[in-house]
UniProtKB/Swiss-Prot annotation:
Glycosylation sites: 229
Domain of life: Eukaryota
Main location: secreted
Keyword annotations of the record: Disulfide bond, Glycoprotein, Hydrolase, Lipid degradation, Lipid metabolism, Secreted, Signal, Virulence
Thermal effects: Optimum temperature is 15-25 degrees Celsius.
Record carries keyword Cytoplasm: no
Gene this chain is encoded by: LIP5
Means of activity regulation: Fe(2)+, Fe(3+), Hg(2+) as well as ethylenediaminetetraacetic acid (EDTA) and phenylmethanesulfonyl fluoride (PMSF) strongly inhibit the lipase activity. Surfactants such as Tween 20, Tween 80 and TritonX-100 show also inhibitory effect in the lipase activity. Sodium dodecyl sulfate (SDS) sharply decreases the lipase activity by 85%. Methanol, ethanol, and acetone have also negative effect on the lipase activity, with residual activities at 48%, 24% and 44% respectively. Finally, lipase activity is almost lost in the presence of isopropanol alcohol.
Species the sequence originates in: Candida albicans (strain SC5314 / ATCC MYA-2876) (Yeast)
GO biological process, one term: lipid catabolic process
Descriptive protein name: Lipase 5
Disulfide bonds: 110-281, 359-404
Length: 463
């Protein structure tokens, strides 16, 4: 099916002048003296070189821009990120949705600022598909801001880099009025699923100390398939059809921590392994590593296996980038978590631990909507209506829960007061997924190797 679709759309792409990839685009390079700018400053800007994509046709919006923003890495070293600002038709300049995509790759040319452009590489399908989640935000009249939160080194799974980038992107958006017409006192809600929840969650947790001035702008954060322990996700997916997530994660960590890379490289006979880890976007990474065991079993790539975590340097990297371990970092803004009980990719146990950590620390408003009937893949769709309802309520000024509330429902489609138009929009997407024949039980993340090869077609059907 995927090959047939690619054949059919090839003539469309043949006539395109493709957007320049970040690795070859000088716009992504920091200007001289950039380190003297304050974090969140706009260093340069431009209209997106190509239209924002709605799949294989440009999205109907009012305008879109890219901002080059001063940020910093995990160690406080100055760097730059690009953030994409999308203005819908009939936009409300007082409302911003900061949407963090699940890029999940250690390759610069997978960045959302590139992937969201019409004509971007087919390996960025997954990010293009997330426009299905962003579109309802635009329909509400919200500006959508989507940062390249992994930064110039593509540091997938790295917490501080990601969270700081999200906050600096928001700072820049609030300063962009002369370019975008966004008000400097605009209200902001953050949203992310899976890898995007990692970035959004770290942003929410870091905000009180890193960007306290945003406290008056931020209305809350919605975190779905919430990643708080990168090791747990690696253990859940290693050796499975989703093992490519482990490869991409190892590449992302290695991009930020050279010593991490050196230690693991010395633990394998496959000396080119890290050269491959940063060569894939999410979908082609998953396809390339189906069933590969990196740290598990008798035929693992890294000889020490999971005992590598006993190395103090490796253990510290893992702990420093797991939000579940950062008990001192507690959001001051309202937070909404939604997660599937039977998630086999991001096990819910560490999400529950993080929820409890924040509750024990006295968080003012934390709502946890647990979905009993969906795993990671399908909760991205079935949980979205609840997240959107919560986001709309924040912009409408409705009351949040007081303290902590954890409710398990059979499905998060049962969340109160979901608009019927939003529910039907996502039910249609779910019907498409369930009829693709991805495996024994896609709602439980049970996907076959053959099913993985069909995943590329999901984006085609959605968009």
């Amino acid at each position: 099916m995927l090959y047939l679709i690619l054949f059919l759309i090839a003539p469309i792409y043949a006539g395109l002048i493709f957007p320049t990839k970040p690795s070859s685009d000088p716009f992504y390079n920091p200007p001289k003296g950039f380190e003297n700018a304050a974090v969140g400053d706009i260093l340069q800007s431009r209209a997106t070189p190509k239209s924002i994509t709605g799949g294989f046709t440009p999205l109907k919006i009012q305008n879109s821009w890219q901002l080059l923003v001063r940020s910093e890495d995990s160690f406080g070293n100055p760097n730059v990120i690009v953030t994409t600002v999308i203005e819908p038709v009939n936009a409300d300049p007082s409302k911003i949705a900061s949407y963090q995509v699940f890029e999940d790759a250690a390759k610069a040319d997978c960045a959302p600022s590139y992937a969201l452009q019409f004509g971007s590489d087919l390996t960025t399908f997954v990010t293009q598909a997330e426009m299905y989640l962003m579109a309802p935000l635009l329909d509400q009249g919200y500006y959508v801001v989507s940062p390249d939160y992994e930064g110039p080194k593509s540091t997938f799974t790295i917490g501080k880099q990601s969270g700081q980038a999200v906050l600096n992107s928001i700072r820049a958006a609030l300063k962009s009025g002369k370019i975008t017409n966004i008000k400097d006192d605009a209200k902001v809600v953050m949203w992310g699923y899976s890898g995007g929840s990692l970035a959004s969650g770290w942003a929410a947790a870091l905000q009180p100390s890193y960007a306290p001035e945003l406290g008056g702008n931020l209305l809350g954060a919605a975190l779905g398939g919430f990643v708080t322990n990168i090791t747990a996700t690696a253990q859940a997916t290693d050796g499975t059809v989703f093992a490519g997530i482990v490869a991409n994660a190892l590449g992302g960590v290695a991009n930020e921590y050279p010593e991490f890379k050196s230690i693991l490289q010395s633990d394998t006979d496959k000396k080119s392994v890290f050269d491959e880890f940063d060569g894939h976007c999410l979908i082609d990474g998953v396809l390339n590593y189906i069933g590969t065991s990196f740290l598990t079993g008798d035929h693992k790539i890294f000889k020490t296996g999971w005992d590598i975590l006993k190395n103090p340097k490796i253990g510290k990297v893992v702990e420093d980038n797991g939000l579940v371990y950062q008990k001192q970092l507690v959001p001051k803004i309202p937070v909404f978590i939604y997660h599937g009980s039977i998630d086999q990719i991001v096990p819910i146990v560490d999400t529950k631990k993080t929820y409890q950590n924040w509750c024990d620390a006295g968080i003012s408003s934390l709502e946890f909507a647990e979905d009993a009937s969906n795993g990671h893949l399908t909760e991205a769709i079935m949980g979205a209506p609840a997240a959107l309802t919560w986001i709309i309520d924040r912009f409408d000024g409705k009351q949040t829960v007081s303290g902590c509330q954890h409710i398990q429902r059979f499905s998060n489609l049962e969340y109160p007061n979901i608009p019927s138009s939003i529910a039907n929009y996502f039910k249609a997407a779910m019907d498409v997924v369930l009829h693709l024949g991805l495996g024994p039980d896609v709602q439980k993340d049970q996907v076959s190797p053959e099913g993985i090869k069909k995943l590329g077609s999901i984006e085609m059907r959605w968009l």
